[in-house]
Amino acid sequence: MKNLKDLTYGIVGLGIMGGSFAKAIRQNILSQSGSTGKILVCNRSTACLSMAVNEGIADEAFTQDKTSELLKKSDIVFVCLYPHATLEFLKNYKNDFKSGAIVTDISGVKGIFEKSLPELLRPDVDFIIGHPMAGGEKEGYAASNAKFFVNHNYIFCRQTFNSEENYNLMKTLVTELGFTRITETTCDIHDNKIGFTSQLCHVIASALVQSARDPEITAFGGGSFEDLTRIAMINAPLWTELFISNKEKLCAHIDSFHKKMEEFRTAIMEEDSQKLKEMLEETREKRLMMGSVCTVSK
């Protein structure tokens, strides 16, 4: 297997995710004794490129018009762009990847890749579909940090054409970056489950904030309101794309949630204490059985 500390990593898109990958690779892998690896970064705006180089995170920075140069040098490429922008990137730079390179993404929807990949990639380039389950309300390179991925989940949607050696290398890599639970699944299952655990939650949080009639309602709020609405501080362009790209699965979850809300509403309006108590007790037991998203006990 290739040695991670001697590889060249290309990061395309230097926002909070791309920046965190670069910083985590620098701290956890390339800081090892005898390391010969490098980090190359590329971004549309140049301010963060200068920051990455000046901070000693990136060895080389490339403006958007020099992307091909980065790709020709990179052994592993993280494409940290929006889903459809990632597809366009793969299409436009198909012939520029280094032979034998591993390419991976960070997108929150996967079905669009599975349908398009066979025609987008060369046989000597291995695209491993991945989803780092980490995020935050802040955006941009300045918000990135080397510990961003610690104790988070990573999902791979392995394809039949993926090399066993490359796939194992990627699992080792993300473990070194701090991820503590790695799951392998299909693109369809990924989109269905992420539609529930992530996208539906963002819809609910957004709807809750939108339904507030009093802009000063937070004066009456406690931890519950804060917990439920934290993710409503949303990146609108990104989440619009994610919602629409996964519309069938997401809307099915919204319908199911709406049905449960109606059941609660009916029990409350009819003062059916027994029914309401049973529903709440069932909810508690079900949540306990689900376990924690956190992979390490606090």
Q: Residue spans of the language-model regions?
A:
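Internal alpha-helical scaffold of NAD(P)-dependent oxidoreductase catalytic cores
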Residues: 146-231
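Short beta->alpha hinge that forms the Motif I/post-I loop of the SAM-binding pocket
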Residues: 44-45, 81-82, 106
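An anion/phosphate-binding loop that grips the pyrophosphate of nucleotide cofactors and donors
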Residues: 74
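Rossmann-like NAD(P)(H) cofactor-binding subdomain of soluble oxidoreductases
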Residues: 85, 89-142
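N-terminal Rossmann-like NAD(P) cofactor-binding module of classical short-chain dehydrogenase/reductase
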Residues: 77-78, 104
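Interdomain hinge/lid region at the active-site interface
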Residues: 216-286
